Amino acid sequence: YGEDFIGIAIHTGGRADPLTCTDYAWKATDYRSRPSLDMNRNLLLGYFKAQTEFEEERSKGADMDVEVSAVWDKEKNNITVTPRVTFCVNRDESPYGFAYVLTEDSMSNPNWVQYNNYSGSTDDRGITKEFDYFIDASRDILNLENNFVAIAAEGVKAPLTGYIKTPIKADEPQSHTYIFKNISNKKIIQDKSKLKVCVLLINKTTGRIENAAKCTISEPNTTAISSLSQGEGQVVETARYTLDGRRITTPQKGVNIVKYSDGRVSKEVVTQ
């Protein structure tokens, strides 16, 4: 699902787990069983796959677009994060708060051991090819690659508020900055080039993640935004959707809904 999917793997095993993220410890206490899997903090999922649930959730769309950019300082010790939220509807109130999560992909170590309780569970074979790997693997798995690993976080237990100004006006972007500080102190990090920043927009009334975005981290003096590149004074496309509300990154055959940086929204017929 590419950039449509934002995964965060939270390890809370303490000293027994080298990937433990202490910043997530208080939020992790909301979930008593391990492992557990949920979507948008409001839908508990099964352990094996959730394609149907994901596609249904994606098709619903959201009341706002969320984009994010991130850049290192020269010492690669601090990361400046700039979320950009554009609402599709007017609202008088703002029950929203932000959470910021730093993740790393492709983490592994020959000394790490993953205990595999599904080893030999042949009755479950065929659910997914990924799950078949664990069925065929030994009880103790070495050299397992860990992705989406939470490294640092803020606002995951109590979302940070005060950044969305009211009344909210449709098609008027709102942005602010947040800084991940002293990243070099996170000894868990293996490869800074594999880090990504996730921004979660959370409804404080419901506890639900309303929308989110992720991005890589640019080098100093450059800018890379998750889905927007815009020159000053230049009208550019900022978002594209299918008729059923699903956000897409490239034109797809049929009718596309296109939003532009000057606030215009138009229908575009793509024939090939």
What name fits each language-model region?
Residues K214-R246:
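Residue-level detector of functionally pivotal "anchor" positions at catalytic/ligand-binding pockets or at interdomain
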Residues V255-Q272:
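C-terminal tail/sorting-segment detector
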Residues Y1-G2, L243, K267:
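Acidic/polar, low-complexity intrinsically disordered N-terminal segments immediately downstream
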Residues E3-N221:
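Short, conserved sequence motifs used for protein processing/export or organelle targeting and
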Residues R247-K253:
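Conserved beta-loop-beta connector loops within the AMP-binding
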Residues S36-N40, R240, N256:
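Short polybasic amphipathic segments
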Residues T205, L243-G245, S261:
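Short, ordered coil/turn segments that flank beta-strands lining enzyme active or ligand-binding pockets
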